[in-house]
Amino acid sequence: MSPATVLDSILEGVRADVAAREALVGMTEIKAAAAAAPPPLDVMAALRQPGIGVIAEVKRASPSAGSLAPITDPAKLARAYEDGGARIISVLTEGRRFQGSLDDLDAVRAAVSIPLLRKDFVVQPYQIHEARAHGADMLLLIVAALDQSALVSMLDRTESLGMTALVEVHTEQEADRALKAGAKVIGVNARDLTTLEVDRDCFARIASGLPSNVIRIAESGVRGTNDLLAYAGAGADAVLVGEGLVKSGDPRAAVADLVTAGTHPSCPKPAR
């Protein structure tokens, strides 16, 4: 029987890929590598800087859009993002649908000095230690991909390694689950991962119900400064931008435009 949703299909592939990697590098070895890695950078300090932060993403493809950009040199792209003023760089490491890899994370870590988010579908504790071993400071946890006990344990493990969890939600119910699990940073994805449909009002609806001490990140739909300002007005502390940057002719300038808008005196301020 075929998987019921797009997310189910993605997770099926992820589990197979994790098992293959763990067969090559066991849990004991990856834990040791994580422990030996340089300490993680302070993600919360980066997110709490004045203005609306920009998280710039290294993203070759997606299930909804297909191929976006070849990105033969992720380190060069990451340096352009950093030069443009990005606070954090997101690196997609899922290979089947997003054409990413841990090699990309390694290359970016060696190239920049700002925090890194590993963006993947985390379903096994192994992936958390793997992220830390490859230099991640922040890790995506998708509520829709985890039952509540797994979400709680994955969040605890992420924080125990000194990383910050970006807990992704798409509905008010998922936001409630994220808060109950202890999420300090919540990302709202306007795209439903089970159907790939987009609900652009999703961020404003969910963000308005979050406590002021929770960092709110808008995760999709930013094509330019108007989108950033709209999300800022709805309570965003930061925006995550991928497709709009990798398809731009000048990624550094594209980031700089967003950063300028997000730090301009006229930009709505976060609620916290």
UniProtKB/Swiss-Prot annotation:
Superkingdom of this protein's organism: Bacteria
Catalyzed chemical reaction(s): 1-(2-carboxyphenylamino)-1-deoxy-D-ribulose 5-phosphate + H(+) = (1S,2R)-1-C-(indol-3-yl)glycerol 3-phosphate + CO2 + H2O
Top class in the EC scheme: lyase
InterPro entries linked: Aldolase_TIM, Indole-3-glycerol_P_synth, Indole-3-glycerol_P_synth_dom, Indole-3-GlycerolPSynthase_CS, RibuloseP-bd_barrel
Gene3D superfamilies in the cross-refs: Aldolase class I
A Pfam short name: IGPS
Keywords: Amino-acid biosynthesis, Aromatic amino acid biosynthesis, Decarboxylase, Lyase, Tryptophan biosynthesis
Listed GO MF terms: indole-3-glycerol-phosphate synthase activity; phosphoribosylanthranilate isomerase activity
Annotated EC: 4.1.1.48
Pathway info: Amino-acid biosynthesis; L-tryptophan biosynthesis; L-tryptophan from chorismate: step 4/5
GO BP annotations listed: L-tryptophan biosynthetic process
NCBIfam families for the chain: PRK00278.1-1, PRK00278.2-4
Entry's family note: Belongs to the TrpC family.
Record protein name field: Indole-3-glycerol phosphate synthase
Organism: Mycobacterium ulcerans (strain Agy99)
Lineage of producing organism: Bacteria, Bacillati, Actinomycetota, Actinomycetes, Mycobacteriales
